[in-house]
Design a protein with these regions (language model features):
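A conserved regulatory-domain signal marking ACT and ACT-like small-molecule sensing domains
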Residues: 283-453
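Short hydrophobic alpha-helical runs that function as membrane-insertion/retention elements
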Residues: 214-218, 272-274, 339
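Positions that flank functional sites
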Residues: 146-147, 222-223, 280, 346, ...
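Active-site C-terminal subdomain of aminotransferase-like
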Residues: 271-283, 305
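Short phosphate-binding/catalytic loops that engage adenosine nucleotides
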Residues: 29, 136, 270, 336, ...
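Nucleotide/pyrophosphate-binding catalytic subdomain
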Residues: 1-258, 262, 430-432, 451
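Active-site-proximal loop/turn and secondary-structure-junction residues that shape catalytic pockets
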Residues: 37-39, 183-184, 278, 316, ...
Length: 453
């Protein structure tokens, strides 16, 4: 049995939905279909999820939502019209969305989650109706009825372990199951969403619970590429990745697959196959425990901007018990997550995403670090990009860090920081944002000019 997930671009129009139908109908093993909300039909289009977020914001302010409401309905109606379906399903979606907009707003986070989740939920209902219209035995199932329980962390929910046993019952259902992605239910019966693009997570959770043999993730690219095609033209396709490699690359900027979605698949040992809805015959990329193709030490290079660094220096820091704990406590008090923390005997650097800082947060953090740690220096640097060089087999190859550093030096890129974990799956380089693309191209040319991945 396979669990198959379709992203928003694969479900953005009636033409796309018919491609999805063909893919499901041609393979009887594709029993559970996890769906996103309708995505972009063209470059400057607006995703349904974004329309719903804007609609929710207006509703919370008590403003008129009618225009945005109709824009959302029009997206579903356009799909129904393109596929020849009746207005019955659209009337159902209209009533559902109206009820959601009119629901309790005393807790804005819960209200926003209900609004966002309606995008996937109503699309699942529409797709199940379309499959039936085309003659398939297909049924929509609500995550609550399926037993998908999550934590009460709105916009960052985590699956509860008991969900997996409950979801196993999906194997016994007849026909095709259409399952909305992106959200689950708390034990109190409230909707709680995963982080953005969380339908990937739903697919992996359902695949784990149903003990699927394969989790297929259909998107709008032929494969995972060794580097961002917007930075390097015609990059090499990656035919096979390990879970750890994909996790590192997804975290560091690869948008093809949500990094959190790998965890349920990894725990169950379920291979993930990333494929293109618009070109299903393409080989795609498989994510597995161990990859067979080891022709190169580096499998991919990913980059992301929007980071800052806090450098803390104090003589004899290494002898001071609890110094690191005090640093992390100050961050925790401010509600900040840190990404990396490379250190020496007398200094350490904290890497943080800049979008976490409010108007006064930076000043408060800097003051506390200086005063409470009695540090010699505390310096914040903005505009940092992180570049991850990733490959499980790097640990078996001497000189990878040296080659990478030389490639950056030859390209006149200054390395602001470098970090490598003990697992040696990845090497992190910090560079100025304006040098990010130059750095990525230099590293790609160093490791992929003669390599087939």
């Amino acid at each position: 049995m396979k669990v198959i997930k379709f992203g928003g671009s694969s479900l953005a129009s009636g033409i796309q939905l018919n491609k999805v139908f063909q893919l499901v109908a041609e393979d009887p093993d594709r029993k559970i279909v996890v769906v996103s909300a309708p995505g972009k039909r063209f470059k400057d289009d607006t995703k349904v999820t974004d329309l719903l977020i804007d609609c929710a914001a207006k509703a919370l302010l008590g403003e008129d939502t009618s225009e945005l409401f109709e824009s959302v309905i029009a997206r579903y109606a356009g799909i129904a019209l393109d596929t020849g379906m009746s207005d019955e399903i659209i009337n159902q979606i209209r009533a559902d969305l109206q009820a959601t907009i009119s629901s309790d707003k005393s807790d804005p986070d819960k209200f926003l989650d209900r609004m966002k989740a309606s995008g996937e939920d109503n699309n699942a209902k529409l797709i199940a109706a379309y499959f039936k219209f085309k003659g398939l035995n297909a049924n929509y199932i609500n995550p609550k009825d399926a037993g998908l329980l999550v934590t009460d962390e709105h916009a960052s929910a985590q699956v509860l372990p008991e969900s997996y046993d409950r979801l196993f019952a999906l194997r016994e259902r007849e026909g095709i199951i259409v399952f909305p992605g992106f959200f689950g239910y708390t034990k109190d019966g409230e909707i709680s969403t995963f982080s953005r693009s969380g339908s990937d997570i739903t697919g992996a959770i359902v695949a784990n619970g149903a003990q699927a043999e394969l989790y297929e993730n259909f998107t709008d690219v032929d494969a995972v590429y060794a580097v961002n095609p917007a930075i390097v033209k015609n990059p090499k396709k990656v035919l096979e990745l390990t879970y750890r490699e994909m996790r590192e690359l997804s975290y560091a900027g690869f948008s093809v697959f949500h990094d959190e979605a790998l965890i349920p698949a990894f725990h169950a040992g379920i291979p993930v196959h990333i494929k293109n809805t618009n070109n299903p015959d393409s080989c795609g990329t498989r994510v597995v425990h161990e990859r067979e193709n080891n022709n190169g030490p580096v499998v991919g290079i990913a980059s992301d901007d929007g980071f800052c660094s806090i450098y803390i220096s104090k003589y004899l820091m290494n002898r001071e018990i609890g110094f690191g704990r005090k640093v992390l406590q100050i961050l925790e008090d401010a509600g900040l997550n840190y990404e990396h923390m490379p250190s020496g005997i007398d200094d350490l650097t904290i890497i943080i995403r800049e979008n976490q800082f409010g108007e006064d947060t930076e000043q408060t953090i800097m003051s506390r670090l200086k005063e409470e740690l009695n540090a010699d220096q505390v310096i914040m640097q903005h505009g940092i990009s992180l570049i991850m060089v990733v490959g499980e087999t790097m640990r078996h190859n001497v000189g990878i860090t040296s080659r990478a550093s030389k490639a950056l030096s030859d390209a006149k890129v200054n390395i602001e920081m470098i970090n490598q974990g003990s697992s040696e799956v990845s090497i992190m380089f910090g560079v100025k944002e304006e040098q990010e693309n130059t750095a990525v191209r230099a590293l790609y040319n160093e490791f992929f000019s003669e390599v087939f991945v």
